[in-house]
Design a protein with these regions (language model features):
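A bilobed periplasmic-binding-protein/Venus flytrap-type ligand-binding module shared by bacterial periplasmic
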Residues: 134-139, 182-184, 259-271, 289-290
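Short beta-strand->loop
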Residues: 101-110, 123-124, 152, 228, ...
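Early extracytoplasmic/lumenal segment of secretory-pathway proteins
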Residues: 25-92
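A ligand-binding cleft/hinge motif common to bilobed small-molecule-binding domains
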Residues: 89-93, 222, 227-245
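Extracellular/periplasmic bilobal clamshell ligand-binding domains
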Residues: 307-348
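Extracytoplasmic ligand-binding site segments that recognize negatively charged/polar headgroups
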Residues: 36-43, 80-81, 85-219
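Mature extracytoplasmic/periplasmic domains
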Residues: 265-323
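Periplasmic-binding protein-like
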Residues: 129, 197-203, 210-211, 242-266, ...
Length: 348
């Protein structure tokens, strides 16, 4: 009897040992997003909670929104990535190219600000951004200037030689700034003629340099070359963390909404787990951690921000009521023409 019991016990141990690799093996899931501060915030503070709860490893594939989309298009039938973060303009292109699949109907979608839900829930905003006005606080203090208050301040002659503008053909910040100014000149997202035709006599004379992206801003602020420029509160916060003397001003006409959207990648290898990750990233706990770790402004109305973020942004509910939402379908339909005209006419 004892021998039989021992044999049975050993058999059970070996059975468990043989089965262990099957049930303890960790799956890997891939998410595409911007590198830098965003990647650091998510990998250090947000994604570990999902990994622990689901016994998975989440690997970030870093890159700009355009880079991530290019990877999706190159491998659309067997994509490596399961979920992607894309700037809203690029996401609109991704959706039109059929690389996203609809989000599952989940309670978390009802917790989002209404503008963060994409049409037919093909994706959703995971981080709220807004392009407003960044300015050099050291320079403004030395000159005795009050902080800027309007998009039309870019055309104020007192800022001659101190305006830095990102290229509208390569930067969402630059495009947003141009469209906001175009709107105040009588244009719209469908009609950019006022902005193009009046630029050379309004904003143009004040511009010291057009830059392809915002990477050069920290250097130009420190040397005093850059005084005023389109930028987001999150980007301003990142520069402040490096000791760069910058501030953010919300234009009285309203900042321009800049969402980072997420979508579940069509044809991904584990759609059920991908949907679960998407729902987690849209949740209040995940977005609260992203806010604390990387100044990511939440799209979930139940998420919380740090006191410093609240002080800098003010009441978020009031702020989002004033943001300008651009028509990405119209913009993307004409973007190639606008880019050529910008490069030829504005940055010649």
């Amino acid at each position: 009897m004892k021998l039989s019991s021992t044999v049975a016990a050993l058999a059970a141990v070996f059975a468990i040992g043989a089965a262990a690799p099957a049930w303890s093996q960790t799956k890997t899931i891939y998410i595409g997003m911007n590198g830098g501060p965003m990647e650091k915030a998510y990998t250090s503070q947000v994604l570990p909670d999902f990994e622990k709860a689901n016994n998975v490893k989440v690997v970030v594939v870093p890159g700009t929104s355009s880079d991530v989309l290019a990877k999706l298009l190159a491998n659309r039938n067997s994509p490596q990535m399961h979920v992607v973060f894309l700037d809203d303009g690029v996401m609109a292109r991704a959706v039109s190219m059929g690389v996203c699949q609809k989000l599952d109907d989940a309670p978390v979608l009802k917790e989002l600000y209404p503008f963060a839900r994409m049409k037919d829930d093909i994706g959703a905003g995971v981080q709220l951004g807004m392009t407003g006005i960044g300015y050099n606080t050291k320079l403004f203090a030395e000159k005795g200037w009050a902080p800027p208050t309007s998009w039309m301040d870019f055309a104020n002659p007192k800022y001659k030689g101190k305006v830095v503008f990102q290229s509208a053909s390569s930067s969402t910040f630059g495009l947003h700034g141009f469209l906001a100014i175009n709107r105040l000149m009588g244009g719209s997202d469908q009609n950019v003629e006022p902005g193009f035709s009046k630029w050379s006599t309004t904003v143009g004379p004040n511009v010291v340099e057009y830059i392809p992206n915002s990477a050069k801003l920290s250097e130009m602020v420190q040397t005093g070359e850059a005084g005023i420029f389109p930028l987001t509160p999150t980007a301003v916060g990142d520069l402040q963390d490096k000791g760069i003397p910058v501030g953010y001003a919300n234009p009285k006409e309203g900042a321009v909404l800049l969402l980072v959207d997420l979508c579940v990648v069509k044809n991904n290898a584990d759609p059920q787990l991908a949907q679960k990750l998407a729902q987690f990233l849209l949740s209040a706990p995940a977005q609260s951690k992203a806010a604390a770790a990387g100044k990511q402004i939440p799209t979930n109305e139940h998420a919380t921000m740090t006191p410093a973020m609240q002080k800098s942004l003010g009441n978020l509910d009031d702020l989002v009521k004033k943001v300008t939402v651009v028509d990405w379908d119209s913009i993307n339909a004409h973007r190639a023409q606008w880019d050529q005209r910008w490069n030829r006419q504005i940055e010649q």
